[in-house]
Amino acid sequence: MNFTGAHILSIQQFQREDINRIFDVADAMEPYALRRRVTRVLEGAILGNMFFEPSTRTRVSFGAAFNLLGGNVRETTGFESSSLTKGESLFDTARVLSGYSDVICMRHPAAGSVAEFAEGSRVPVINGGDGPNEHPTQALLDLYTIRKELRSKGRGIDDLRIAMIGDLKHGRTVHSLCKLLGLFNNVSITLVSPKELAMPDYIVEDLRQAGHKVTITDDLPTSITHIDIAYSTRIQEERFASKEEADSYRGRFRLNQAIYTQFCEPNTVIMHPLPRDSRAEANELDNDLNTNPNLAIFRQADNGVLVRMALFALVLDVADQVDKYAREVRWFSSLRAN
């Protein structure tokens, strides 16, 4: 894939060599993310951060990644502050706003909306999530995290055993991650959810046609006994008809330390795309896992900055120039100290 000037809209754009290229560049970004060095390689460049759906981590992570490369960020959040409320099309919005930016990150609640926006854009557009469809940068950072966690244990992604747990129907992160995992060899995927929240059939079929083993179950304990990764997801309350309907599923697939100790292998890595619902009745990861060294959710979030830095460097064609515009850091940073 030629990254220069490219839109990043779907995981299906990538081949395995493209993934390796992104991850190699992400590895090279670590000194900058940890404030050991600073670079001005994107000095003068502008990121248009356009989020028409609530976001904290993804929006701030994109902004931080661009800032760490020396660029500037302009934010647009919510429909109420945009001309879309006046009937303006996504194409027209893109045509105008792309004149104010060098690259745009966009999140929108409608599936396919970011691709529609990209058709009108004169600059690269990166999909920050389009409704229940895809979240390609989250899938990339998830896979990057899996690679780093398994590498520390002397493993690779091939022959991975992973359980995906929770709302697999509405969770765009698991949709995109499954598509990425399809590029690797001999992956075993266990899908753990109530049947009403099951992974879409077409994703399951694509994985099986690619030669991967897919198991579908609603039993949490038996699904996590022989896995490398437990990937939990939240109930996507905003995609249900009512809060009561969403609440009916809470607590059924909650992973806590007692269940982990009883059923998981000692090195099983725990992941979650965040935000997690930490309330006692919620469906996700209990707070008593916070001291478990295999809880990777915060390392996962940190990795998002590295992967997004890599994507910006690649689509703006500066991946090989980052060090040229670097210098040592002058200020104290707790991140660097750790």
From Swiss-Prot:
It catalyses: carbamoyl phosphate + L-aspartate = N-carbamoyl-L-aspartate + phosphate + H(+). Its EC number is 2.1.3.2. Keywords: Pyrimidine biosynthesis, Transferase. This is Aspartate carbamoyltransferase catalytic subunit. It comes from the Bacteria. Heterododecamer (2C3:3R2) of six catalytic PyrB chains organized as two trimers (C3), and six regulatory PyrI chains organized as three dimers (R2). Carbamoyl phosphate binds at R57, T58, R107, H135, Q138, L274, P275. Catalyzes the condensation of carbamoyl phosphate and aspartate to form carbamoyl aspartate and inorganic phosphate, the committed step in the de novo pyrimidine nucleotide biosynthesis pathway. GO terms for molecular function: amino acid binding; aspartate carbamoyltransferase activity. Pathway: Pyrimidine metabolism; UMP biosynthesis via de novo pathway; (S)-dihydroorotate from bicarbonate: step 2/3. GO terms for biological process: 'de novo' pyrimidine nucleobase biosynthetic process; 'de novo' UMP biosynthetic process; amino acid metabolic process. The keyword Transferase applies. The keyword Transferase applies. Belongs to the aspartate/ornithine carbamoyltransferase superfamily. ATCase family. L-aspartate binds at K86, R172, R234. It comes from Cellvibrio japonicus (strain Ueda107) (Pseudomonas fluorescens subsp. cellulosa). One of its GO terms (cellular component) is cytosol. InterPro entries: Asp/Orn_carbamoyltranf_P-bd, Asp/Orn_carbamoylTrfase, Asp/Orn_carbamoylTrfase_sf, Asp_carbamoyltransf, Asp_carbamoyltransf_Asp/Orn-bd. The gene is pyrB.
